[in-house]
Amino acid sequence: MAFALRGVTAKASGRTAGARSSGRTLTVRVQAYGMAAEYIWADGNEGKPEKGMIFNEMRSKTKCFEAPLGLDASEYPDWSFDGSSTGQAEGNNSDCILRPVRVVTDPIRGAPHVLVMCEVFAPDGKPHSTNTRAKLREIIDDKVTAEDCWYGFEQEYTMLAKTSGHIYGWPAGGFPAPQGPFYCGVGAESAFGRPLAEAHMEACMKAGLVISGINAEVMPGQWEYQIGPVGPLALGDEVMLSRWLLHRLGEDFGIVSTFNPKPVRTGDWNGTGAHTNFSTKGMRVPGGMKVIEEAVEKLSKTHIEHITQYGIGNEARLTGKHETCDINTFKHGVADRGSSIRIPLPVMLKGYGYLEDRRPAANVDPYTVARLLIKTVLKG
């Protein structure tokens, strides 16, 4: 590669060498860099007014390396960023530390480039207050590990036109046909934004994320993808990486994706959630229904603790309508999508399996969901 600026030319040619001057042109031989690593983290602005209805908490920046590294996070150095610009520090002491914890292939740039999920640490070396992954790590002891918790995360999102902020595919200044034909819909009259949803699914697969599927949702312009089944730390990492990919691909499509729990508050329209399927080893074996019932009883006693951490703005979604239970009520049932905790019918018929927590909003922190379920079910 060659760089020229104001009569200065630099040519990449193997190892770094000296500079050679010839007239007004300075030629510098430099090492060609061979890999880009996108360091990704969650900021401290989620839910703040300046974010509006977008609820996008993802940040990232690129670090280049001379030679490709592997997929082991320990190979990647810590890095820093300006926390005063992300809601994570004051200007007079603004440096925060990024520590790599998960590395996957970058499906956009392609191999050997990578995406690097990071935890955020304060200058004193302690986990930052926004580092919810660290809080999850702390609760995973030998007992939790032995229970081999599995999670399946149903991430809903709503597409918005970049220029207008209007829901993608909706008529300008108006509403589409009533809900009904759009859930798992097919055809230009029913499915809005499929190219982005498909591109996102493909990117997640290429990155090696455990994405289980996608579907158009009840409200037009609303989609869902599923991550899992995976363990607790993998759940948080993969949901956050998948969210970053969704936002990044949206740049190319001119579509903004929002995790706002209730993007349309006028009319008969569904909200946007993140139903979380959860099981322990004891739930997944014959006779596990008893363990599931015990877990539901524990969850009924910690409803307020969960609901206050299940996403900002969730009260607008959990109204008792549109396949939700009222936010102030705890209810469970078999095949009941108006419940707080749903037991799928096949689980009841088999007598073992998993439960579905239908309370989390689309903008919920996945590390927090994983931690609270462990805390209540296994440590309560």
Curated annotation (Swiss-Prot):
Localization: Plastid, Chloroplast
Main location: plastid
Residue span(s) of domain GS beta-grasp: 35-125
Gene3D superfamilies named in the record: Glutamine synthetase, N-terminal domain, Glutamine synthetase/guanido kinase, catalytic domain
Plastid keyword on record: yes
Keywords recorded for this protein, A-Z: ATP-binding, Chloroplast, Ligase, Nucleotide-binding, Plastid, Transit peptide
SUPFAM superfamilies in alphabetical order: Glutamine synthetase, N-terminal domain, Glutamine synthetase/guanido kinase
Entry GO CC: chloroplast
Keyword Ligase: yes
A biological-process GO annotation: glutamine biosynthetic process
InterPro entries membership: Gln_synt_N, Gln_synt_N_sf, Gln_synth/guanido_kin_cat_dom, Gln_synth_cat_dom, Gln_synth_gly_rich_site, Gln_synth_N_conserv_site, Glutamine_Synthetase
Catalytic activity: L-glutamate + NH4(+) + ATP = L-glutamine + ADP + phosphate + H(+)
EC annotation from Swiss-Prot or TrEMBL: 6.3.1.2
GO molecular function, one term: ATP binding
GS catalytic domain segment(s): 132-380
Family annotation (PANTHER family): GLUTAMINE SYNTHETASE, GLUTAMINE SYNTHETASE 2 CYTOPLASMIC
Subunit note: Homooctamer.
Annotated family: Belongs to the glutamine synthetase family.
Protein known as: Glutamine synthetase, chloroplastic
